[in-house]
């Protein structure tokens, strides 16, 4: 395989962008393991006082990821996130105003491999969320598993990540005067296995838990489609029924984590590696679907609102696809 190396005279800004994305990929793939390793090293080194203090902290703080987390604006304002945003670049697109007197559930589509668009738009302050949607506070929900990793949990909470448990979503949406936004990647980890370039397959037909929560809380539903999310990585071919796909799905059921085998470019060359391609991401926030609070929603009400949401998502995609390079004949595939 011929390796295409990056030229030496790359501007400093682009080098900083690459560095920013490298630390993000490292954090996503390896930082949790490193933090667990540090914790084990402290045990082996018998640093008992420090360990006792941290274990006590974990005991007292264990429920925080399910109670709105603990964001630090100074972390969300780190300059590294500006370079992260500019690498692709990432752009947040508003289609209409959102009244801060309501709470919202934003369904984010598609998952992609590493959910770069969701992180860049809702976990940093560099794509203009606060300016586009004044009075709203975004909470991006991820697998509860990550909040069990010592030290790593503090880092991911600092940027506004919270648990995807039902308790966590209900807590975010319980704000009586409105202004909170739960961002749920509704396709879940399973959808990442379909994150191939050009793929428009969304795992959503059986995903109705967020619909039920929206009805119980009276939270308005907002479809969000991130154009370019699936273009960031190549993935080893894994069609349904293949041996690789069966193994991946089995591991996903056991561990709750999907393991897509992906690759793209490297730091100093463009031929292979785990760095994403420089492809633009346009995250389009659709129009809200009003939802009346219903303490005990029936199955018919859940189905009806789910169909309404699917229609709004399809409409959002069709309205914007040509602008972002999707051929006219292409449409979303719901599975």
From Swiss-Prot:
Pathway it works in: Glycerolipid metabolism; triacylglycerol biosynthesis
Molecular function via GO: 2-acylglycerol O-acyltransferase activity; diacylglycerol O-acyltransferase activity
Keywords tagged on the record: Acyltransferase, Endoplasmic reticulum, Glycerol metabolism, Glycoprotein, Lipid biosynthesis, Lipid metabolism, Membrane, Transferase, Transmembrane, Transmembrane helix
Cysteines joined through disulfide linkages: none
EC numbers, comma separated: 2.3.1.22
Enzyme class per UniProt: transferase
Xref: CDD domains: LPLAT_MGAT-like
Family annotation (InterPro entries): DAGAT (IPR007130)
Catalytic activity field: a 2-acylglycerol + an acyl-CoA = a 1,2-diacylglycerol + CoA; a 2-acylglycerol + an acyl-CoA = a 1,2-diacyl-sn-glycerol + CoA; a 2-acylglycerol + an acyl-CoA = a 2,3-diacyl-sn-glycerol + CoA; a 1-acylglycerol + an acyl-CoA = a 1,2-diacylglycerol + CoA
Transmembrane intervals: 24-44, 47-67
Gene Ontology biological process terms in this record: diacylglycerol biosynthetic process; glycerol metabolic process; triglyceride biosynthetic process
GO CC, any one term: endoplasmic reticulum membrane
Location in the cell: Endoplasmic reticulum membrane
tRNA processing keyword on record: no
Membrane topology: Multi-pass membrane protein
Glycosylation sites: 125, 180
Family: Belongs to the diacylglycerol acyltransferase family.
PANTHER family: 2-ACYLGLYCEROL O-ACYLTRANSFERASE 1, DIACYLGLYCEROL O-ACYLTRANSFERASE
Physiological role: Involved in glycerolipid synthesis and lipid metabolism. Catalyzes the formation of diacylglycerol, the precursor of triacylglycerol, by transferring the acyl chain of a fatty acyl-CoA to a monoacylglycerol, mainly at the sn-1 or sn-3 positions. It uses both sn-2-monoacylglycerol (2-acylglycerol) and sn-1-monoacylglycerol (1-acyl-sn-glycerol) equally well as substrates, and uses sn-3-monoacylglycerol (3-acyl-sn-glycerol) with lower efficiency.
Name under which the protein is recorded: 2-acylglycerol O-acyltransferase 1
Taxonomic source organism: Xenopus laevis
Taxonomic lineage: Eukaryota, Metazoa, Chordata, Craniata, Vertebrata
Gene this chain is encoded by: mogat1
């Amino acid at each position: 395989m011929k390796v295409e190396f990056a030229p030496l005279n790359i501007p400093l800004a682009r080098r900083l962008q690459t560095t920013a994305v490298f630390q993000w990929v490292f954090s996503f793939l390896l930082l949790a393991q490193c933090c667990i390793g540090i914790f084990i090293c402290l045990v082996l080194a018998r640093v008992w006082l420090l360990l006792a203090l941290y274990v006590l902290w974990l005991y007292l703080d264990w429920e925080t990821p399910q109670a709105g987390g603990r964001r630090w604006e100074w972390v969300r304002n780190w300059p590294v996130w500006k370079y992260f945003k500019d690498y692709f670049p990432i752009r947040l697109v508003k289609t209409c105003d959102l009244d801060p007197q309501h709470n919202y559930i934003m369904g984010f589509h598609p998952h992609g491999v590493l959910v770069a668009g969701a992180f860049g738009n809702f976990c940093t302050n560099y794509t203009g969320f606060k300016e586009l949607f004044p009075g709203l506070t975004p909470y991006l929900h991820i697998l509860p598993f990550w909040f069990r990793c010592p030290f790593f949990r503090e880092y991911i909470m600092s940027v506004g990540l919270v648990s995807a448990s039902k308790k966590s979503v209900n807590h975010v949406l319980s704000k009586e005067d409105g202004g909170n936004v739960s961002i749920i990647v509704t396709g879940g980890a399973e959808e990442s296995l379909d994150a191939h370039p050009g793929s428009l397959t969304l795992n959503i037909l059986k995903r109705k838990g967020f619909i039920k929560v929206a009805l119980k809380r009276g939270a308005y539903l907002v479809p969000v489609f991130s154009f370019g999310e699936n273009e960031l990585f190549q993935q080893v071919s894994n069609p349904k029924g293949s041996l690789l796909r069966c193994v991946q799905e089995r591991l996903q059921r056991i561990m709750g984590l999907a393991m897509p085998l992906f690759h793209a470019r490297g730091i100093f060359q463009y031929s292979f590696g785990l760095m994403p391609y420089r492809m633009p991401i346009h995250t389009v926030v659709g129009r809200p679907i009003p939802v009346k609070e219903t303490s005990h929603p029936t199955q018919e009400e859940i189905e009806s609102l789910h169909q309404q949401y699917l229609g709004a998502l399809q409409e959002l995609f069709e309205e914007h696809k040509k602008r972002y390079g999707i051929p006219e004949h292409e449409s979303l595939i719901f599975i």
